[in-house]
Amino acid sequence: MGLFFDDKENVFQPTDFRLVGLHRTAAYILGVDPAEEAPKLALSDETRLIAEKYVCIAVQASTQCKYWNNPTGWMEIVAYLKKQGYRVICIDQRPVHGTAIVWNHIPYGAEDQTGNRPLTERARWLRHAEFFIGLSSGLAWLAWAAGTPVVMISGFTHPINEFYTPYRNINWHTCNSCWNDERERFDHHDFLWCPRHANTPRQFECTRLITSQQVIAKISAAIHALS
């Protein structure tokens, strides 16, 4: 899969990947059907890791604009899930991640299954989870492949960027979708990249203004669909 940020003349891609989504751009390059289809996983061990019902979460990301920047969001979600009788399993690579003066921690109350572990282990956790709650990140794609319902929290990407999930959270009343804006060039070296509102009170408002109540509504819909 090729992501060509500066291909203004469409030499390497017939349409800009930001307009068609990460998982469709290769299809456009190859000239095949761009309809999305989750890959099928064949795990050598398909057994459950714990007997109780549980939810997987992943809160970390490679850049701050991907995070859910609501300061109390994850804490409130974990508390809500535990009240519903779920164990909450965090399957990030790291329990803490960030840069300079900005660091993001595993939410209080979540069980720590972070670490440099095989993706097959992550997939096994996801396969038996009631659902997954996470960001526009690799573990969300792995959950999709595992056949697990995904509650996604993302504001810096437009929904076209990822696979479809009925449980996506985005706030259309704030700045949003800068990643999919051809006018903005993502800076892989700026962890605090926010092209429209950097160093202003509006920085990262795309996810900061996604409320826990909004996410809980999507979680409730996922729970209802499972019942």
Which sequence ranges carry the predicted segments?
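Catalytic machinery of carbohydrate-active enzymes
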Residues: 1-227
